[in-house]
Amino acid sequence: AIDTDLAELRSILVRLAKALAPGLDAKAVAGELRERVLEELDYEYEAQNQRAFARAYDGHPFIYVPKVHSRLSRRRVLVSDYVEGEGFEAVKRLPQDERDIYGEIIFRFCFGSIYHLQHFNADTHPGNYLPMEDGRVAFLDFGMTKRLSPDQIQLEQRAIDAAGRDDAEALREALHDLGFVANPDRVEAERLMEHVKMVGGWYMEDREVQITPERVMKMVEVTSDPRSDFFDLVRRESLPADELMGRRMETGLL
């Protein structure tokens, strides 16, 4: 049944891509999505992921990943340490300064894992982050993760550095090398920079940034609304299959 649903999703993605994003390799993206979903249903694979993150963050001052009990776990059963923590509704009632700390910890975990482990959790969902009494945040659910090669991470750093320096030509070149821009000569570098800053500038700016609902809606608009000033640019861009989970992590984090 799952394979049938995923095959139908692939068909829908291909049809949508032809109309909305001709540059997108929808079959490759659907294949990546299928692989990650099937991994998420395999609890033995999830246990391997969770053990890797638990080892990496063992003793960390503000990040906690529960230990997996391998002898009690099976392909369809995953047992780990019990965590006492607050839910997201409790987080929303915290004072602003405490919410800022909570948000910073999650940001550092999500993005820091990429650069420190070459491995990140793509399932960014508020139910997976539990503030603990000692000030740490517990991170749960490692069924959907993604590993990146050092070369890919280096290319992403090039793109972020170029955006931070406002070097539009270098940004266009880096995004071409990553596979986001197939034909750089057809994409104006300055417009591409403006588009990237509107969508991802919140984590490229070296200052405190407040993420408001209005800012999030603007990000959605410039990437998906045909009436957007950037929609013609979006149609010339692509989404490499290897970048799908990274973008999922970013949007979920927002």
For each predicted feature, which ranges?
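Hydrophobic residue at the +6 position relative to the catalytic HRD Asp in the kinase catalytic loop
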Residues: 127-131
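Conserved ATP-binding subdomain of kinase catalytic cores across diverse folds
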Residues: 1-89, 101, 105, 116-117, ...
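Hydrophobic HxD+1 residue recognition
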Residues: 122-126
